[in-house]
Amino acid sequence: FGSDFRSIPYLTTIKNSEESITVVTTEPVRSGRGKKLVINPVEEFCKSNNIEFKYFSQDAVYRNMDIGISASFAKIFSPGFIKSNNNIFNIHLSLLPELRGPSPVESAILNNNSKTGFTVFRIDEDIDTGKIIFQQDVTISEDDYASNIYERLSNSFNENYKEIDFLSTGVEQSQNSSRTSKFAKSDFNISEDSLFIAKTKIRAFNIMGPSFTSHKNKILKIHSYTEESNSEGIMYK
């Protein structure tokens, strides 16, 4: 189960490791001024690699599915769907129960965490609360961008995939949890921020955003920055 570009590295690992897979993704949507029908990156990947795919429905029952793996999927499974398809796991990009919710990678950078990781857990009716079957940590350096962390996590999943026991009953998550939020466009604005916070936001939002500021009534999008030891300031790009 996947629906955006962040799903593809995980889909690639599973495709290269399993004899047979079927991908479930979201239907095309109409977008832009011309309201053209646009397919998502996962559907494009499936078509390019001759992978069977289906469109998601909350009413679907996948009787031939041994296990299901969700990676960056845009839908929340209903209780009825979970009951009918009860062997589905999610790949969450944090060390659960820390940083539950929609923005764990970005929040880890904003929190100045020194490490994060990924968690594979059995999906239940709540959000990111199911029994954990596998976790692996990765480091975060002070100059890492979100894009670096996404790549590091998918590489770690690829390296550890064969070690994940999907038949495991898993372990309950502890009660010491934290949650992330869905960011709004206003959160990407660094105009009033200190230098330290601005730099942190630029790194955290280079995929989701980017960060921006304004100058002479123009919006300036900032994807990255560089610092020179002999410079009087920072160069934003």
Name each region found by the language model.
Residues 223-230:
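A short, sequence-level motif marking secondary-structure junctions
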